[in-house]
Design a protein with these regions (language model features):
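Signature of uroporphyrinogen-III synthase
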Residues: 1-233
Length: 233
C-alpha cells in the first residue's frame, strides 16, 4: 500500500535522487535547472597564474565540474566542501576534504580563517549568495571566484496544485532562488502548511515574504528529508 501524504521538494533537474522514507513520500518538482558552462580557458589560465592554496566547493555539481575540467591545473590545494553531498562527490577523486561542523556558508568561513594569508578559489554557480565573498573582501583575503555553472528558472505548471492538495504536508525549498519562484507562484494565497528551508539565506528570503519557516537545515538534503519524515509518522 502506497503512502498518500507527501512533501514537495524542489531540487533542480539532475540533482534529485530518490530516497527511502517511512511515513511520507517525496514529490520532487524542479523550479530550476542547471546549465553547465563546460571548460573555460580563461579560468584555467587564471588558476595557473594564481595557484590557489584552498578551494571551496559549495555543491556536488560544482565539485564534479571542478574535477572534470580544472583540478589538474591546481597544485594540490586544500579542499573545503560545504556539506556531505559535496564531500561525497569530491571523495570520488581524492580522499582529503574538509567539511565544516555547521554545513553552510558560515561554517565554510570558520574553516577559511586559517587561510588568511593564502589564495582561495571559489568554484560555484553564478547565482550563489555573497556571504563567503563578503567575508573574504572584508578581511582583505586574496580570492578568486569562478562561475562554472548557472541556475535558471523553469516553468512549473503542477507545483501549485500539488502544494494545495490535502495530501501535501508542505514543501522543502533548497535555495533562495527557489524561494522567490515559490512566492511568485503562490502569491496572494494564505499558506498554512509547513515550509522547510535549506540554508540561512533561503530561510531569510522566505521570512522576507512573510512566511513562517517550520525548520531550517544545513546543506544536507537527505538529512532534512529524514527529519521531516520522522516528524510525520
Amino acid at each position: 500500500m502506497g503512502i498518500s501524504r507527501y512533501i514537495i521538494t524542489t531540487r533542480p533537474e539532475g540533482k534529485f535522487k530518490p530516497m527511502a522514507t517511512e511515513c511520507i513520500s517525496i514529490k520532487n518538482v524542479p523550479l530550476t535547472k542547471i546549465i553547465k558552462t563546460g571548460r573555460q580557458e580563461e579560468i584555467i589560465q587564471d588558476i595557473i597564474k594564481n595557484k590557489p592554496n584552498a578551494v571551496v566547493l559549495t555543491s556536488s555539481i560544482g565539485a564534479s565540474e571542478f574535477f572534470k575540467y580544472y583540478y589538474k591545473y591546481t597544485e594540490d590545494p586544500d579542499i573545503i566542501a560545504i556539506g556531505n553531498n559535496t564531500a561525497d562527490e569530491i571523495k570520488k577523486y581524492r580522499a582529503n576534504v574538509s567539511v565544516p561542523t555547521i554545513r553552510n556558508s558560515y561554517g565554510v568561513i570558520a574553516l577559511l580563517k586559517k587561510y588568511l594569508n593564502s589564495t582561495i578559489a571559489l568554484f560555484r554557480s553564478s547565482e550563489s549568495n555573497n556571504i563567503i565573498n563578503d567575508w573574504l573582501e572584508k578581511n582583505n583575503i586574496n580570492f578568486r571566484e569562478y562561475h562554472i555553472y548557472s541556475v535558471v528558472k523553469i516553468e512549473s505548471s503542477e507545483i501549485k496544485d500539488l502544494f494545495l492538495d490535502t495530501n501535501c504536508i508542505g514543501i522543502l525549498l533548497t535555495s533562495s532562488m527557489e524561494a522567490r519562484i515559490f512566492h511568485d507562484i503562490l502569491s496572494g494565497i494564505e499558506i498554512t502548511k509547513n515550509i522547510y528551508a535549506i540554508g540561512n539565506v533561503t530561510d531569510e528570503t522566505l521570512r522576507s515574504y512573510g512566511y513562517n519557516v517550520s525548520f531550517t537545515g544545513n546543506s544536507d538534503f537527505e538529512s532534512i528529508v529524514k527529519y521531516i519524515d520522522s516528524k510525520n509518522c
